[in-house]
C-alpha cells in the first residue's frame, strides 16, 4: 500500500515542483506509533526555504484533498532533505562528486558493507569512494546496483 501511495504522490507533486523550479528528492509514507506521515523532501541548487516548503505543502494538500488517494488519516510534511541528503538517482551521485558520502551495500565489498569517504568518481555504473584507514587512503569501487542506500555525510574534520 505505501509503495502505491509514494508513486501516486510523486506523480501529483512533480508538476507543482516543476512550476517552482524545485526537485523531488524523496517521498515517504510511514507509520510511526499510531500516526501515519506523508513526507515529501524537496530541494534545488540554491536550497529551499520555509516559504517554498509551505507553497508546495499547500498546493499538494489541495491536490490530495481532491483526489483522496490515501485512506488513512496522515500528517503531511514538506521539507528539505537536510545536510545528509539521500542519494537516490544517478544524477544525485554526479552532484555529490567531491563530497563526503556514506554508503551501505547489499553484499560485502573488500569485507565491508558500509563505507564513508569522498566520492571521487561516478561513471553511471561504478561509484569510487576514497576512504581513510588510519593514515592511509584507499579507493573502493562500488557497483551502482550493489548500493543499498547512500547519503551525503557531514564531516567535522
UniProtKB/Swiss-Prot annotation:
SUPFAM superfamilies: YhbC-like, C-terminal domain (SSF74942), YhbC-like, N-terminal domain (SSF75420). GO terms for biological process: ribosomal small subunit assembly; translation. It comes from the Bacteria. InterPro entries: Ribosome_maturation_RimP (IPR003728), RimP_C (IPR028998), RimP_C_sf (IPR036847), RimP_N (IPR028989), RimP_N_sf (IPR035956). Pfam families: DUF150_C, RimP_N. GO terms for cellular component: cytosol. It is found in: Cytoplasm. Keywords: Cytoplasm, Ribosome biogenesis. NCBIfam families: PRK00092.1-2. Belongs to the RimP family. HAMAP family: RimP. Required for maturation of 30S ribosomal subunits. This is Ribosome maturation factor RimP. It comes from Bacillus pumilus (strain SAFR-032).
